[in-house]
């Protein structure tokens, strides 16, 4: 499961997620990608499920890049515990995602294969996404 090796603090405030992504909102590595259209927290398990779906469909051809990493600790109090008495114990890590953030990128496969693989990955994620293609992508010359 994805999580940081070491964190400076064990607990973190929730924070607010307003506005669109200011960074990580353009394709940087591949020709294809999926872009988030809403604000949500994505867990390491969800990212891993999406990664497995993509690699299985692409049959280990091409290359993929995961552009998000779960580095925000989430706490939870046990069941049947009253309010107060301090913050709960750390339960796991999430990656905060805002609209416009690129989640996964792919390269080295035909357009149809990339579109279907990233559609399968998007089904594993809790956010609505949009399939995007690099602006200078030429379908005629890319017969991978």
UniProtKB/Swiss-Prot annotation:
Swiss-Prot/TrEMBL GO biological process terms: translation
Record field: transmembrane: none
GO cellular component: cytosolic large ribosomal subunit
Cystine pairings recorded for this chain: none
Disordered, as annotated region: 1-24
Compositionally biased residues, Basic residues: 1-13
UniProt similarity note: Belongs to the universal ribosomal protein uL16 family.
The protein's name: Large ribosomal subunit protein uL16
Naturally occurring in which organism (per UniProt): Phocaeicola vulgatus (strain ATCC 8482 / DSM 1447 / JCM 5826 / CCUG 4940 / NBRC 14291 / NCTC 11154) (Bacteroides vulgatus)
Source organism phylogeny: Bacteria, Pseudomonadati, Bacteroidota, Bacteroidia, Bacteroidales
């Amino acid at each position: 499961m994805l999580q940081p090796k070491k964190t400076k603090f064990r607990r973190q405030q929730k924070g607010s997620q307003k506005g669109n992504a200011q960074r990580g909102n353009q394709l940087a590595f591949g020709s294809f990608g999926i872009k988030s259209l809403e604000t949500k927290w994505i867990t390491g398990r969800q990212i891993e499920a999406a990664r497995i779906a993509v690699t299985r469909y692409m049959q280990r051809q091409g290359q993929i890049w995961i552009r998000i990493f779960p580095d925000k600790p989430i706490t939870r109090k046990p069941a049947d515990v009253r309010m107060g008495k301090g913050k709960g114990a750390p339960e796991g890590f999430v990656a905060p995602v805002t609209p416009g953030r690129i989640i996964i990128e792919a390269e080295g496969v035909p357009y149809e294969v990339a579109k279907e693989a990233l559609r399968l990955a998007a089904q594993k994620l809790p956010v609505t996404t949009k399939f995007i293609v690099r602006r200078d992508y030429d379908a005629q010359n890319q017969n991978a």
